[in-house]
């Protein structure tokens, strides 16, 4: 038995297909979903959704949102999403490195708003790099 998975942003459907398994970046940690999972509603962090439609895993960078699981259907509503296969790994790594520098600078500045904005940009860049197949040491 498989899961019906839909990943939806405000302007497009990023994924609409069957999957054997899905791993979500919930606000309480990584959450694995298989068919027959109990009904669930969870908030999602900025991170990487991992979907296994067959033998291989697909990655999708998501920019926070919510996921609902019910009757082998997984509906994921996110602010933004990008398939890992469409992200250039070198560009994503460069963006992540630049975001890390901006975060370090913002941390030293003492400006709380600047720190929060830099941290959000860093999380988005990290998610894109991880989804592209890059390894990020935390």
Swiss-Prot record:
Keyword set, alphabetical order: ATP synthesis, CF(1), Hydrogen ion transport, Ion transport, Membrane, Thylakoid, Transport
Gene Ontology cellular-component annotations: plasma membrane-derived thylakoid membrane; proton-transporting ATP synthase complex
Organism lineage: Bacteria, Bacillati, Cyanobacteriota, Cyanophyceae, Oscillatoriophycideae
InterPro entries in alphabetical order: ATP_synth_F1_dsu/esu, ATP_synth_F1_dsu/esu_N, ATP_synth_F1_esu_C, ATPsynth_dsu/esu_N
Top-rank taxon: Bacteria
A family per Pfam: ATP-synt_DE_N
Residue ranges, annotated region (Disordered): 89-117
Function: Produces ATP from ADP in the presence of a proton gradient across the membrane.
Protein's name in the database: ATP synthase epsilon chain
GO molecular function: ATP binding; proton-transporting ATP synthase activity, rotational mechanism
PANTHER family, alphabetized: ATP SYNTHASE DELTA/EPSILON CHAIN (PTHR13822), ATP SYNTHASE EPSILON CHAIN, CHLOROPLASTIC (PTHR13822:SF10)
Biased composition (Basic and acidic residues): 89-114
Region forming the signal peptide: none
Membrane topology label: Peripheral membrane protein
């Amino acid at each position: 038995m498989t899961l019906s998975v839909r990943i939806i942003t405000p302007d497009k459907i990023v994924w609409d297909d069957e999957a054997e398994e899905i791993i979500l970046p919930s606000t309480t940690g990584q959450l694995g979903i298989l068919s027959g999972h109990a009904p669930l509603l969870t908030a999602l962090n900025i991170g990487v959704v991992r979907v296994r439609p067959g033998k291989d895993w697909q990655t999708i960078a998501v920019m926070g949102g919510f996921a609902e699981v019910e009757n082998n259907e997984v509906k994921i509503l996110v602010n933004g999403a990008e398939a890992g296969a469409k992200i250039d790994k070198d560009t994503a790594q460069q963006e992540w490195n630049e975001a890390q520098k901006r975060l370090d600078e913002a941390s030293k500045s003492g400006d709380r708003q600047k720190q929060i904005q830099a941290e959000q940009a860093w999380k988005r860049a990290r998610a894109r790099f991880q989804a592209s197949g890059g390894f990020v040491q935390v």
